[in-house]
């Protein structure tokens, strides 16, 4: 009797596992299908938005080549470098801001600490684009919406609010025993040495997370870049360029190039994720061993 019960339980468990894996596989296919379609369309030989078949009839690399040779509508290489420069600068500044604010809130007791945390919590409840118009007119009054100052304006917009996004990093720093800081201070270490030699190495997983999010924000943003850069195409980012490819007068010819551009734009994020994932795994394995 016990064997029959065990056999029935195993059969139910096996059936449940099969159903679970089928559902997960179906969801994976549904999720990956649009990405696969865009990649295939980027190699399609021809023009137009729609074709009668899911896969292209003929393949070519001309769509990728056109992005770097045909500047009649957009200058894709320049937009790519504009975005890369702004995203890298914003990433470095934002990560530094978050680390500094998180450390001061986690380890240093000061008078306005709790009011600042409460204020930051309220501010993060509102989307950033609500301040877009005010930010634009402030930058315009300062003369920072013309010429190369547009780069600085974009970097300021993307990194200036990083100081209020400290919650995840601070929560992680709170888990680090303060006894480590006290022992280091007894040995004669300064606050800066404790921060750089002890806290930062232990925060590697969260630093990786912060780097990824700080880079992806400027890389994928459209609203602030469009408002600040305006019609000055030499300062456009890739999001504006890709959007411009889908304008009514260009979409028939540039749709397949749009797909090629979308593939190229995803490469830096994929590379960053792969590199930081390795660092994250190494940091976590080191923490477990420690």
State where each predicted segment sits.
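Short, Lys/Arg-rich, polar N-terminal cytosolic tail immediately upstream
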Residues: 1-11
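A structural signal for multi-pass alpha-helical bundles of membrane permease subunits
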Residues: 10-12, 16-290
């Amino acid at each position: 009797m016990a064997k029959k019960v065990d056999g029935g339980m195993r059969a139910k468990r096996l059936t449940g596992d099969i159903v679970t894996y089928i559902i997960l596989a179906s969801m994976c296919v549904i999720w990956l299908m649009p990405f696969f379609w865009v990649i295939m369309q980027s190699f399609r030989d021809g023009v137009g938005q729609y074709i009668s078949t899911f896969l292209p009839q003929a393949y070519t690399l001309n769509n990728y080549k056109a992005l770097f040779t045909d500047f009649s509508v957009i200058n894709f290489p320049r937009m790519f470098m504009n975005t890369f420069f702004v995203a890298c600068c914003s990433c470095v500044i934002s990560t530094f801001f978050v680390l500094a604010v998180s450390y001061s809130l986690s380890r240093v007791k000061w008078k306005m600490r709790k009011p600042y945390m409460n204020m930051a919590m309220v501010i993060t409840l509102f989307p950033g684009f609500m301040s877009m118009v005010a930010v634009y007119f402030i930058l315009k009054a300062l003369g920072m919406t013309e010429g190369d100052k547009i780069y600085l304006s974009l970097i300021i917009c993307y990194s200036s609010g990083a100081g209020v996004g400290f919650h995840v990093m601070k929560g992680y720093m709170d888990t680090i025993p303060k006894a480590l800081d006290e022992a280091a201070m007894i040995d004669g270490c300064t606050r800066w040495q404790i921060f750089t030699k002890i806290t930062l190495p232990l925060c590697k997983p969260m630093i990786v997370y912060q780097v990824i999010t700080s880079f992806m924000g400027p890389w994928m943003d459209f609203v602030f870049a469009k408002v600040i850069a305006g019609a000055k195409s030499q300062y456009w980012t890739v999001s504006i360029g890709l959007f411009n490819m889908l304008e009514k007068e260009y979409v028939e010819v540039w749709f397949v190039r749009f797909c090629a551009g979308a593939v190229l734009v995803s490469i830096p994020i994929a590379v960053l994720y792969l590199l930081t994932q390795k660092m994250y795994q190494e940091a976590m394995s080191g923490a477990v061993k420690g």
